[in-house]
Amino acid sequence: MAAKEVKFASDARDRMLRGVDTLANAVKVTLGPKGRNVVIEKSFGAPRITKDGVTVAKEIELADKFENMGAQMLREVASKQNDKAGDGTTTATVLAQAIVREGSKAVAAGMNPMDVKRGIDLAVKAVVKDLETHAKKVSANSEIAQVATISANGDEEVGRILAEAMDKVGNEGVITVEEAKSLATELETVEGMQFDRGYLSPYFITNAEKLKVELDDPYILIHEKKLSNLQAMLPLLEAVVQSGKPLLIIAEDVEGEALATLVVNRLRGGLKVAAVKAPGFGDRRKAMLEDIAILTGGNVVSEDLGIKLENVTVNMLGRAKKVVIDKDNTTIVDGVGARTDIDARIAQIRQQIDTTTSDYDREKLQERLAKLAGGVAVIRVGGATEVEVKERKDRVDDALHATRAAVEEGILPGGGIALLRALKALDGLKAANDDQQSGIDIVRRALRAPARQIADNAGEDGAWIVGKLLESSDYNWGFNAATGEYEDLVKAGVIDPAKVVRTALQDAASVAALLITTEALVAELPKEEKAAPMPAMDF
């Protein structure tokens, strides 16, 4: 086991504080509409330019192991904030730095770290309650666009496209962000349930111009196994022909004689039919087939469920208003499944999302949820250069998360004003002792930090502006750093999602309290690299 170096008490906290300051000072310059850029060197290719706090935080690694511990714990604040709310990472970092700095001073002055922590927790609880009281629910499309614009660092085009995407696919829909091959940023939406399987034979095509299969009001057979001959389902096919409606077959595969028979029937015009492979693999395939069955009001033909193909009747088939199939995708529009069954399935998937520990599984479950509940939208981000596209894609991702957060918990005035106004919530707080009171005062001072930093980044005197803002009792009145005006920030469209502000404070206080109550640091001593022996010489 390698030898360790141990630091104690104030020496340990000072080392960590230096690391915290290094990371926070690099991150906080990006805060606000006039935040500065940070340029990050890459081991290959062009350097990366970003205004995204968490991207900067993830790139910082310090040479001193003890300083690096402080920096990494602060990085944890940005990462947690990014995972929970998707935005507000810089605000969380600024708050954490302010709490750690003030807390370290208090502990160095001889106060009990645990009581200081209790005071911080007490103050945070009071501020969170105040934020929840003042949060205003978001419903209008224009408000959603405003939130998205702010999170995208003032990019109005991104705000408009995101609001349009949310409007089309709903709050539960999946919105993915990709890099475009062109200059323009575009939105593409898919209504209904889409899965990535195309037609099994081009002979099924009904629209020769678009090379698509379009089936109106079709029956849908959902089969778990392969279909290699159609003998077992002849009675079913005859019943479908008599009904005069088209048929879509979804199966693990349709091969050989079965596929040939379907193609011949399709070409002769006796049966309007198309076949596609089932989406997914293994257990996920079973779950997705069940989703399709619930959406279309049909049954999955599966031996596990005791349903054999020869016993299937027309009543057991799914139905939909329309099905569109191209060479890569199948889209089912307006399935006739019962709303109560679909809602129950959605609730079940939500439960699985909450309990799963795998990020991959969570992503796949969210895709299934979106296909059942809303739809899918793809935002293709364009730009003149690769560096610009990457930077813009970062901002669109931020804006997407912030917009979802705003719809979830409502909005507050932006620019750090909501935290400034929450100072009043701390006035009536009763502490059990002086050390706890010190913890409350630490949060009181930290709440001013984001507004001050936004003003500083805009080239103004942050401390003076914060003092002026505290003179007003109007909750929404604040400093608009983008225009340099004092105004009603909600009317001006300077708004923050309540969830972003709340989680920023909670995450910052949580990690800062851990740093304040740290009494020892342990790190490996650097290994001495011995010089390589000289090679043997030939004389």
UniProtKB/Swiss-Prot annotation:
Record key words, sorted: ATP-binding, Chaperone, Cytoplasm, Isomerase, Nucleotide-binding
EC number annotated for this UniProt entry: 5.6.1.7
Reactions listed under catalytic activity: ATP + H2O + a folded polypeptide = ADP + phosphate + an unfolded polypeptide
Principal place of residence: cytoplasm
Matches recorded under SUPFAM superfamilies: GroEL apical domain-like, GroEL equatorial domain-like, GroEL-intermediate domain like
Cellular location(s): Cytoplasm
Record PANTHER family: 60 KDA HEAT SHOCK PROTEIN, MITOCHONDRIAL (PTHR45633)
HAMAP family: CH60
Protein name per its UniProtKB record: Chaperonin GroEL 2
Protein source organism: Sphingopyxis alaskensis (strain DSM 13593 / LMG 18877 / RB2256)
